[in-house]
Amino acid sequence: VLAALVSESALVGETAPAAGSTRPFAHGIERARLPTAVVVTPVGPPAMRGERRDVQHLGRAGARWRFPVEVAFSEARVMALLGALPGGLPGIGRPERVKAVLRVGEDEWVLVQRAGEAVTLAPTAWRRDNRIEVQLAPGEPWHPEAWDDLWLRACRR
């Protein structure tokens, strides 16, 4: 078994496992299976400069969005969206986890997280840009354009 692990580790450029490691090469092997090209999809009007990067990992689909610091989100719309997700928004899949750092005021930023049915909101010192991550449950259908639309509707106008 160790010989098989060592030969697999050579494929992904890993060195020998640390003493006592229970999964010595799992991360390296998984990294080797990841796509090398990242597709960046523009989101919203060109002036908004939003972007989405789709993610497929361990049977889960999802994406990461980035919007520039000039874009602000409506805290009420974001919370309504996340509160409705357990089954109230058809056609977008069932999210397993949502995490975002969003500007919701002139100098007010929040960390928003949803795992299971729980939604939390907390102030954060992050000020670089708006970031959103969505991970669907395994096997859920992925409709990225529908998610793009949801985030655009949550922006303040």
Regions found by a protein language model. Give the residues of each.
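C-terminal accessory "lid"/substrate-recognition subdomains
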Residues: 1-127, 138-141, 147-157
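Active-site lining segments that contact anionic ligands and/or coordinate catalytic metals
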Residues: 129-131
